[in-house]
Amino acid sequence: MNRLRAGRPLALALLASTGLGAAVVLRPQLLGLPVAQVDLVATLVAGLALTTAALLSPRRLLSAGFLYLLMLILFHLSIPVVLALGGTLPVTFAAYIGTWYGSSDVTEAVYLSMLAVLALTTAYAWVQVRRGGNRPAPHPPAPTPPAFTRIGAVLVAAGVTVYLGTLVVVAPDLLRGGSYQEYLDTVGGTRTVAGATLVVAIGLCMAAVGAPGRARTLAWLLFGVFTLVTLSFGARTAAMFPAVAGVVAAAACARRVPRARTSVALIVAGLLAITVVQQVRGTGLAGAGPAAVSLNPMGSFAETGGTLRTVAEVVTWRRTYQEPPYHGRTYLTPVVRAWELATGRPRPPGNQDPRYAGVLLYQRYPDFQLGFSPVAEAFLNFGSTGVAVLFAGLGALLAGFDRRRLGHLGAARLGVLMYALSYTVRNASNAVPLTLIAGLLVIWCAARLLNRPPRPARRPVPVPA
């Protein structure tokens, strides 16, 4: 039995490698399959990837690798998975995907998404094998300073206050059950809301790594309020991505591996929240009664997978319109814009700069509300080879973090990284540099502040006799 367990990581790594090799070698055959068979293959790939990540990481279902894979699959492969499993789609969404799903470009989009999942899983598995399976790190890190947790709680409180204050001043109807469209028309995408959400995420990553106490409890309670408010008008990712980052950070420095029941309960609760929010975001809570809400997740999961269409559109640009590869330009745009700002060169506003992949998509399809996709951006820049290399690198990076138990600083940094990666699951990469710089800088400043040596006590001035 022990030999069987010892050989499991190697077997999973070989299985993932076989899947990746088959996807590369059999690419023409896969692209020529009927849609129903492509959906079935995508379902098998998703199951293999999630099983591999869950079994190889010491933190199981709360590892960074597993949760990132889950989100990547949820936003890119949930349509083919739901269709393969015979799930029932909402009438309006079924009519919507009927206008584009099933073409050869969509088949290649599904293939590219599977390639990304397999590349990430394979790299993740081999790093785990190289580091010796799923044994936990032997040396526990030092405890988190209470002041570090309190700083995180203060940041969460500040971010939630700014976010709610903005809603009260600019869009009070959202607090009375407004819809997601009202959110987009008023405060969605504004710098204030985006900045407040980032502050909440950074603060939550810092507070989550602390020991149980008032500060950590307060941070999670405030984030709970933030979650209820954002979910009430359908802004699901505003709460989802910080929550994933906070959970990953907390698990990364936990003294014990979270119980399977706890992990499953957290994931199921998150998926059910997505199910409910997906159904009420069109009308808001004010226009949705209990009879309009169903806990059957299949339709909601499929709607979440609409990000796949952004991949299909980029495939159309490259294949049908012969658009040349961008060779990394969209990834370098934040750096170029920062240089233009520093040197005083003219530049368009960020939401109108077509050098950003998401802006380019919006300018070509103004009715889209799908953000973008890391798979689409990698393919736009470097083709299918770029997709495989990029996601293999991500898999190796996440496996390196998941292999060992981190101290409070390392876990908080992992949380910030997870937030940046989560954000790009359905968006372009333009916010990643600022997110990482801001988060890592705040954590560094907090650590320096807490590690300053105390000032020496002043010597009393002698009083003359």
For each predicted feature, which ranges?
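Hydrophobic alpha-helical segments
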Residues: D367-A465
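Small-residue-enriched transmembrane helix-hairpin modules in multi-pass membrane proteins
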Residues: Y180, L272-L394
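N-terminal "leader" segments that precede or initiate the main folded domain
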Residues: M1-P136, G246-A273, N430-A447, P456-P464
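Conserved luminal/periplasmic juxtamembrane motif of membrane-embedded glycan-processing enzymes
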Residues: R8, L12-A16, V25-P28, G234, ...
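Aromatic-anchored segments of alpha-helical transmembrane domains
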Residues: S17-R27, M71-A84, A158-T166, F223-L231, ...
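Hydrophobic alpha-helical transmembrane segments
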Residues: V41-L50, M114-L118, G159, L167, ...
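Membrane-interfacial loop-to-transmembrane alpha-helix junctions, especially the N-terminal start
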Residues: R5-L15, R60-L74, I151-G152, G213-L221, ...
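Membrane-embedded catalytic interface detector for glycan/lipid assembly enzymes
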Residues: L33-L40, Y96-Y101, A125-R256, R261, ...
